[in-house]
Structures are given as C-alpha cells and as structure tokens.
C-alpha cells in the first residue's frame, strides 16, 4: 500500500483534492476537503491533510478571526512566533486567537491531518524556511 493510500485510510474524513487554491501558501503538497461552508455559516470547516514535510506559511487570522485545529491523523507541528514548536498527535486541539502569528504542518516523516475551523480572514506571511523547519526534531 502506498503512503498516500495509507493516509486516505487513516483519516476519518475523505482526503479531498489537492489544495491548489492555497498552494502558494504551503511548502509541499496539501489536500483540502471542505466539510462545512456557506453564507449562513460564519466559519469555514475543512479537513486539511499534509504530506510528510509539508507546512503552511506563517500567517494570522484577522477581522474577528480565529482558528481551531482538531488533529485527526499522523504527527505534526504547531508554532507561534517567538515560542517553541509544539508536537501534535491525534486528539490534540489547538486554539489560535485573533492576530497570533503561527504556522502548522506535518512532521518530516509523517502524514498529518487536522480539521480546521476558521473564522475571519487569513493574512498570509512569509514561508517557514527549510532552515527553521529542519531544526525540528523527528516527531
């Protein structure tokens, strides 16, 4: 079984399609399965899956924004600017308040998936450099 097939089976939600709309804000390949969206719902809810080593850029949620991450598969990382990275595993929950600069993504050798519940707008910033990322220990 390929790693992609294993990742599809490990998650509780479908993998979704390649995350082409946001690819410019990611280092590596991610997949997005929108779970809840619509004008009557004030948040977006989606399952995001990251290939090993994939991570998003530094970013923050603005205009009344916040984000909740519910880890559903694999191993990954979350880091706020100026703080140490936090290792993430299945069952972890991350609460990200408005304006907090952060990034999240997969460990070097693991697929990673989370449900992201996001309100407001996202302000995308610089990429997490390979040098920064390579300093992380193996998860």
Regions found by a protein language model. Name each.
Residues 32-33, 78, 114:
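Short hydrophobic/aromatic-rich beta-strand segments that constitute the beta-sheet cores
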Residues 46-62, 98:
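Conserved short histidine dyad/triad with adjacent acidic residue
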Residues 47, 60, 72, 80-82, ...:
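Residue-level recognition of conserved beta-strand positions in structured domain cores
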Residues 1-43, 57, 124-139:
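A short, N-terminal "cap"/entry segment at the start of jelly-roll beta-barrel domains
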Residues 55, 63-90, 100:
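A short beta-strand-loop-beta hairpin characteristic of the jelly-roll/cupin
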Residues 84-85, 90, 98-123:
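Ligand-binding loop in jelly-roll beta-barrel domains
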